[in-house]
Amino acid sequence: MIMKRLLIIYLALCFWGECSYAVEKQKDIEILYNRLLEEYLSDSIDVSQAEKDLAVMQTDGSWKDIDYKTVTFYFDAERHLKRLKNMALAYSKPGNKLFHEQELRKKIILGLDYFRIANPDSGNWWYRDIGAPSQYMIPLLLLKKELQREDVTRLSSYLVDKTDNMAHKGKNRTWVSAVLIHKGCIEDDYELIAKGFSSIASTIYVEEKDDEGMKRDNSIHQHRPQLYSGGYGMSLMSD
């Protein structure tokens, strides 16, 4: 009987410990979410442009003046994501007439869904792996608290973990890591966030070979042996 009671107490303590750990994880996610939210809400918004884009959005969530199908080095579909970001900022930022306007919220979700399904391509891999996801994640994060769980799961499926691709080094690695961190924050997935930060930390080393990364003389190489301290390097250090 004593052993049975001890076992029950032990299991209860284990359960309590797991619950406490889960609560702490969620607190960390909320801290990260609020910091990201604060950063994005500091951006300026063009309410007039958001109204115009809202008015001319098609019923499927697209815009007629954007080419979603032609695959070229230039990525015209990027304009779709920039519009959604401005609209999401207008919806999320207090003090403007579009703040928490429900028709706007519906159209932003529609626009995210359209982009996710259409999955526009580019002749430049950077837009596929980094550029488009880095812009798609912002309006989705801004609307996170306004979405049902199934909407979050569906929409965040566009954000794919690219950190396992070892070809992504230096600044490119911090970019794909940021996408993963946002995905984890949007989905309340602590492990994805931790993996993203670990991926960023992996860039902090001296690259001895003729490859991308930090060098012994404190310079930064990107695009293989090219010296890029003032471009990619400055951006990498700011991360």
Question: For the regions a protein language model found, what residue spans apply to each?
Answer:
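Hydrophobic alpha-helical membrane-insertion signals
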Residues: 27-50
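Functionally constrained cores in energy, signaling, and assembly domains
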Residues: 10, 46, 85
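Sec-dependent N-terminal signal peptides
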Residues: 6-15
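N-terminal secretory signal peptides that target proteins for export/translocation
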Residues: 1-3
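Aromatic-lined, polymer-binding surfaces characteristic
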Residues: 51-239
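Boundary at the C-terminal end of the N-terminal hydrophobic targeting segment
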Residues: 19-24
